[in-house]
Amino acid sequence: MTFISLGRRLAPWVLPVALLAAWQGAVVLGLLSTRILPAPSAVLAAGWDLLGSGELWTHLAISGWRAGVGFAIGGGIGLLLGFITGLSTWGERLLDSSVQMIRNVPHLALIPLVILWFGIDESAKVFLVALGTLFPIYLNTYHGIRNVDPALVEMARSYGLSGFALFRQVILPGALPSILVGVRFALGFMWLTLIVAETISASAGIGYLAMNAREFLQTDVVVLAILLYALLGKLADLAARGLERAWLRWHPAYQAKAGAQ
């Protein structure tokens, strides 16, 4: 590994590490009250204690389950609707306007109605996460299919491709970059929605951990929960980027990026 490549790998971490160092220094020097924002070392100690007791693992597992199930349901529906409206003119006429109207309703504003529908159990939280992840994947799937080069489609048809073979070998690969962008957006909305969803009478989860800590003025635990959401969001984005690297190796833009690295 050359010095330049090492620098490229470390560059994204320079600003976060500098901010943490400045944060710790401000608390140690008394420039920042621990009642407002505890030191990173105090947040780390709180996390270590929760890990040791096993409580943090429980909250992480439950939040991860809610996020994963909601993403699978919402993403699956969004992908299916995107395929229908992207591949079929009649599908677009029948579905797109209705989907767009629903998309423009803030899904977090539906919380009172969701509680009436599902109560306060897991179904309400999963429904909100699914609703938050559906539309980014739908829009990018639809956009990706509609922007496949028509000349490529006609060329494939001239070689005898049609039906599912045409979809699998030409349309889907052409739409895949846009679909994966939708996945990255959806993963961000997934954690954003979950933060609010876990305030609905939850008894476990990272959101519950933060709300419970607030009641007891445990600022270090509240900050820990916020940082956990940020870390989980970053890990999810890294996973999506890993899918891009694995599935888009053939794409000229990604080949050029890999060559530059």
Residue ranges and their predicted role:
Residues 1-27:
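N-terminal signal-anchor/first transmembrane alpha helix
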Residues 3-5, 29-73:
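Periplasmic/extracellular loop-to-transmembrane helix junction in inner-membrane transport proteins
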Residues 69-99:
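Transmembrane-helix boundary motif in ABC transporter permease subunits
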Residues 89, 146, 177-181, 224-261:
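C-terminal transmembrane helix and the adjacent membrane-cytosol boundary/short C-terminal tail
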Residues 97, 140, 144-182, 210:
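Short cytoplasmic-facing helical segments at TM-TM junctions of multi-pass membrane proteins
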Residues 100-136, 143-144:
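Generic hydrophobic transmembrane alpha-helix motif, especially the helices
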Residues 115-116, 145, 192-229, 248-258:
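Glycine-rich helix-loop "coupling/hinge" segments at transmembrane-helix boundaries
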Residues 127, 131, 164-196, 220-223, ...:
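Transmembrane alpha-helices
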